């Protein structure tokens, strides 16, 4: 499927141009992180086979692993039934979280 067809399936209007993206370990199924993508970051992700996101705080694109070396290699991309959320299954190199934890979801609330 080409980029134009993929872009048509995604509803970027609901999230003001951003789409929440869940990152999951391809092999273990562990949820690693949640980040946001825009059209450009999704295109770069598909083109490079590594994850790219939109930083809401810095207001810029960032390639996961570019600084740390903890790249995420894309195995598959899925869209939810409403077209307003993505699930990307990756091969994760090293920890996904900036704290050094494997997953950003390491704190139990209940």
Curated annotation (Swiss-Prot):
Zn(2+) binds at residues 81, 97, 104. Mg(2+) binds at residues 80, 82, 84. Its cofactor is Mg(2+); Zn(2+). Signal peptide: none annotated. GO terms for cellular component: cytoplasm. GO terms for molecular function: magnesium ion binding; phosphoribosyl-AMP cyclohydrolase activity; zinc ion binding. The keyword Zinc applies. Pathway: Amino-acid biosynthesis; L-histidine biosynthesis; L-histidine from 5-phospho-alpha-D-ribose 1-diphosphate: step 3/9. It is found in: Cytoplasm. It catalyses: 1-(5-phospho-beta-D-ribosyl)-5'-AMP + H2O = 1-(5-phospho-beta-D-ribosyl)-5-[(5-phospho-beta-D-ribosylamino)methylideneamino]imidazole-4-carboxamide. Pfam families: PRA-CH (PF01502). GO terms for biological process: L-histidine biosynthetic process. Transmembrane segments: none annotated. Keywords: Amino-acid biosynthesis, Cytoplasm, Histidine biosynthesis, Hydrolase, Magnesium, Metal-binding, Zinc. InterPro entries: PRA-CH, PRib_AMP_CycHydrolase_dom, PRib_AMP_CycHydrolase_sf. It comes from the Bacteria. NCBIfam families: PRK00051.1 (NF000768). Catalyzes the hydrolysis of the adenine ring of phosphoribosyl-AMP. Homodimer. Belongs to the PRA-CH family. This is Phosphoribosyl-AMP cyclohydrolase.
């Amino acid at each position: 499927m080409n980029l134009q067809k993929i872009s048509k399936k995604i509803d970027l209007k609901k999230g003001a141009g951003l789409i929440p993206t869940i990152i999951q370990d391809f092999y273990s199924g562990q949820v690693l992180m949640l980040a946001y993508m825009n059209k450009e970051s999704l295109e770069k992700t598909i083109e490079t086979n590594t994850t790219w996101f939109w930083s809401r705080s810095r207001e810029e694109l960032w390639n996961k692993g570019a600084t740390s070396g903890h790249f995420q290699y894309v195995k598959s991309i899925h869209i939810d039934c409403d077209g307003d959320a993505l699930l990307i299954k990756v091969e994760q190199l090293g920890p996904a979280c900036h704290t050094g934890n494997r997953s950003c979801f390491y704190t139990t609330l209940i």
